[in-house]
């Protein structure tokens, strides 16, 4: 993703400090999407995505943990998946964790920041994508830990295995004696 620009490292701090201003800036930027946003929107699942979905369909792959936010695994047919860094096609309440498809979530520029639609929840809504500096939602961490504990084989594919907490899961599995398969163009 660095080919098309990197998101700011202080994005969550900016959001948390002034969510209204963050949303105003986001609405202004949506008129001219970044190269990064355009590249993600144009991306299509590749044979790797389809291959993993097929492994799940035939019962070889039980669950997929991904750091990708592009929804390509789901679009390829993956069913059992945890998107540890969220999904850019969804919105999420920062307080209760409720989620909505981005296409169905209406943001009123006159009433920012947008608030949760769940009854009795005053939470602020943002993109489901986890920003730099933002805590990963607890339910995603719980599910990743749960699936790691259940794994009888663990594959890491196309990752440097350096971004935590995702990098801890193959290590935890290996410490339990679970076979680890690494598919990566570079040694990690």
Q: What is each model feature region?
A:
Residues 1-188:
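Conserved catalytic core of sirtuin-type NAD+-dependent deacylases
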């Amino acid at each position: 993703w660095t080919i098309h620009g990197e998101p700011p490292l202080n994005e969550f701090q900016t959001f948390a400090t002034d969510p209204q201003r963050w949303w105003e800036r986001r609405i202004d930027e949506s008129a001219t999407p970044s190269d990064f946003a355009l590249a993600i929107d144009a991306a299509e699942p590749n044979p790797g995505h389809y291959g993993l979905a097929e492994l799940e369909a035939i019962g070889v792959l039980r669950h997929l943990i991904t750091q990708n936010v592009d929804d390509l695994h789901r679009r390829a047919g993956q069913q059992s998946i945890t998107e540890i860094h969220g999904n850019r096609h969804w919105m999420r309440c920062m307080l209760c964790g409720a989620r909505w498809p981005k296409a169905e979530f209406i943001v009123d520029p006159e009433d920012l920041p947008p608030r949760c639609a769940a009854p009795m929840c005053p939470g602020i809504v943002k993109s489901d994508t986890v920003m730099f500096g933002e805590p990963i939602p607890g339910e995603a961490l719980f599910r990743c830990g749960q699936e790691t504990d259940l794994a009888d084989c663990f594959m890491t594919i196309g990752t440097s295995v350096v971004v935590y907490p995702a990098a801890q899961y193959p290590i935890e599995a290996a410490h339990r004696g679970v076979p680890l398969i690494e598919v990566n163009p570079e040694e990690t």
